[in-house]
A protein has these predicted regions:
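Transmembrane helix-loop-helix hairpins in multi-pass inner-membrane proteins
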Residues: 1-32, 36, 90-202, 282, ...
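Membrane-interface helix starts
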Residues: 7-9, 40-49, 222-236
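A short amphipathic helical element positioned immediately N-terminal to and/or at the very start
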Residues: 32-40, 108, 213-225
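Hydrophobic alpha-helical transmembrane segments
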Residues: 46-50, 77, 81-82, 158-163, ...
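Membrane-embedded helical hairpins/re-entrant loop segments and their flanking transmembrane helices
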Residues: 61-85, 252-269, 293
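Alpha-helical transmembrane segments of multi-pass membrane proteins
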Residues: 78-87, 264-275, 304-314
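Short, membrane-interfacial amphipathic segments enriched in basic
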Residues: 196-215
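Transmembrane helical segments that form the transport core of multi-pass membrane transport proteins
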Residues: 223-272
């Protein structure tokens, strides 16, 4: 019953945010002119943009495949692509992308991959994913002062908030991994405060769950210490993966035969949006992403700003949602129906 309520809440929340986004973005706009502009866009430039979205999903699957092999688990790359698709699909439709990794762990379990192994792999993917955003965000903040003042004056508070939240998240997860005793003390103290002020009801099993979660962080620390080269390679793959997704907007820009703004400027403007919205409790950053795009890309797209936003978000978010949804269905029909030895993977 509790699970059903959560599913219903997430569904209603997603529909509500989507409806408000559509209303906020398109209310009072000339939709006919916008559609004419979209139809006139050069599809030869949009096709590579869509390919980059697929590459983005594929990039995580390569990381999963690579880390599984470091554990001696031999998986087919197409299986890892299904794991990746499941993660991106449920991340797209749940607040703060909270549903992606639990569902990945569920499907990995269907392939007889233990929860401790999948938890470590998914933890490292999360840390490196956010670490790349932090590096890009700090790089823009420190070395792009002119860039900040030219394009980001109107959204600097949101950018710094997003960057700060990502830095906090990476720092906190690093403490959890490398200082589990300190992390345990902090979390126990936090739980006691929440229970004292009746924000959370006291539950006997909550501390036991906390202890179990600490095992994941200890295992992650052990992996990081014994596989430094693997971690460096994962960070490099993640960086390329993220840059590919940021570059989608440049292909939209070229599809309208626009010029005057360089590739790296467009890429880093899109990166700023990702840094700003990544930690916000909205499915896919819906609503705030569109607002930020319409603010910072005004000097780039000019009169084609709204159709540019529609195509950029259409490829970068809704394209990702569609591709990952299709392969999530495949995952359910192949992996999700498997049982026990029928789904057994090869171990070295």
């Amino acid at each position: 019953m509790k699970k059903n309520k959560k599913v219903i809440f997430n569904g209603v929340f997603l529909v509500a945010v989507f409806a408000l986004t559509i209303y906020g973005v398109f209310h009072g706009e000339d939709l006919e002119s916008m559609m004419d502009a979209i139809r006139s866009a050069d599809k030869r430039w949009l096709a590579p943009g869509l390919a980059l979205v697929a590459f983005f999903i594929w990039g995580e699957s390569i990381i999963i495949w690579y880390m599984m092999r470091s554990y001696g688990i031999k998986l087919k790359k197409r299986t890892c692509f299904l794991f990746s698709s499941v993660g991106f699909f449920f991340s797209c439709i749940t607040p703060s992308a909270s549903g992606g990794q639990p569902m990945q762990a569920y499907y990995m379990k269907k392939k007889n991959i233990s929860i401790p192994v999948s938890a470590v792999i998914l933890m490292i993917i999360t840390i490196t994913y956010k670490l790349v955003l932090v590096v890009v965000g700090i790089g823009v903040a420190v070395f792009g002062r002119g860039f900040l003042h030219q394009y980001l004056e109107g959204i600097l508070p949101v950018f710094y908030l997003g960057l700060g939240l990502n830095i906090f998240c990476v720092t906190f997860m690093t403490i959890l991994v490398f200082h589990p005793l300190l992390a345990r003390s902090f979390l126990v103290w936090g739980l006691s405060i929440l229970e004292k002020f009746r924000i959370l009801r006291h539950k006997e099993g909550r501390l036991k769950k906390l202890e179990d979660s600490m095992d994941t962080y200890r295992d992650t620390a052990a992996y990081l210490k014994t596989h430094p080269r693997v971690i460096v390679n994962i960070i490099a793959i993640t960086f390329v993966q993220r840059m590919a997704m940021f570059a989608v907007t440049w292909f939209v820009y070229k599809a309208f035969s626009l010029s005057g703004t360089g590739f790296w400027t467009v890429l880093f403007l899109q990166a700023v949006i990702s840094v700003s919205v990544d930690m916000l409790p909205l499915p896919g950053g819906m609503g705030i992403s569109e607002t930020l795009f319409l603010t910072i890309f005004t000097p780039v797209f000019g009169t084609l700003l709204l159709p540019g936003m529609v195509l950029s978000r259409g490829l970068g978010y809704y394209g990702e949602l569609l591709i990952s949804a299709l392969f999530t269905i495949v995952a359910q029909l192949t992996i999700g129906q498997g049982h026990g030895k029928d789904n057994k993977e090869s171990y070295e």
